[in-house]
Amino acid sequence: MRKLSVTLLSLLAAVSLLLTGCGSSVPGPAPVGSGDTLEGNITISGAFALYPMMTRWAEEFQKIHPNVTFDISGGGAGKGMTDAVSGAVDIGMVSRSIKPEEEAQGAYGVAVVKDAVFPTVNANNPVINEILAQGITQDTFIKIFITGEITTWGEVVGKPEITDEIHVYTRSDACGAAEMWAKFTGDKKQEDLLGVGVNADPGVLDAVIKDPLGIGYNNLGYAYDIANNAPVAGAIVAPIDLNTNSQADTDELFKTMTEAMDAVATGKYPSPPARPLNVVTKGKPTGLTQTFILWILNDGQQFVGEAGYVQLPPEQLAESFAKAR
């Protein structure tokens, strides 16, 4: 045993001298990002619906490719489309379907995730208990947001003696959320929606929270607080009475964000107002932009659920990947 130890020590000493004589050293771990040739800046604008998810994707992508930077701004789906088609940004975030006339201008849309719009009311609404028990039918929403036939909260829940006036809030910026809500309320367009125009998703929610008689609509990630897995404090997601049985069934009442996400994923929540969210480029994406979009559709999908979004069905995800490739 002693002979073996001496021999081993002698061998190690010889190796050490050899390395020293050659001026070599054992290399340490490579710094993060070393050898990474991917670099550049990606500019993105558009839908508030996709904004939180996009910022998360950008953060995670930068951990892998630290020499890539991002400039991300909101502004609504309309701005995202205009900016993408004009070449003002590399990627436009668009929370609605791409129109034929936009495709004719070079808009190239790729679906990346699924989201939905939900009706929101103030938590202190005078008939909140009735709303949560009965739900609100699609026809009632049409009469509130489109025709204006229903103007009091008593009419909503079948109690005409309650005369509190409904205060309707809608989006003032061109956006996918409004377009999807308009499609749900009678296959209409954003400009057909009644109400006081408020800018952006957070703006509508804030208006509803400050007004006990208010009603609006918000994307999933704004209607719910992901940290608490519940509607944002001061607001309630009004159940949609889809089967018109005058009661909010368990598959229509979403007390938690998880329940709402499951309903969107399984198709129990109607589409519209559920829909895919898209990234739009001018022509088929290339270079760094394409690399980022392909990453979103592959490794980037692992962050979708924890960010409060719903993954596309596998077949649609594969279709998007093939389209972006």
Q: Language-model segments: which ranges?
A:
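Bacterial N-terminal signal peptides that target proteins for export
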Residues: 1-9
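Sec-dependent N-terminal signal peptides of Gram-negative exported proteins
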Residues: 9-15
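Exported/periplasmic ABC-transporter solute-binding proteins
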Residues: 23-85, 94-98, 103, 110-111, ...
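C-terminal motif of bacterial Sec signal peptides marking the signal peptidase cleavage site
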Residues: 16-21
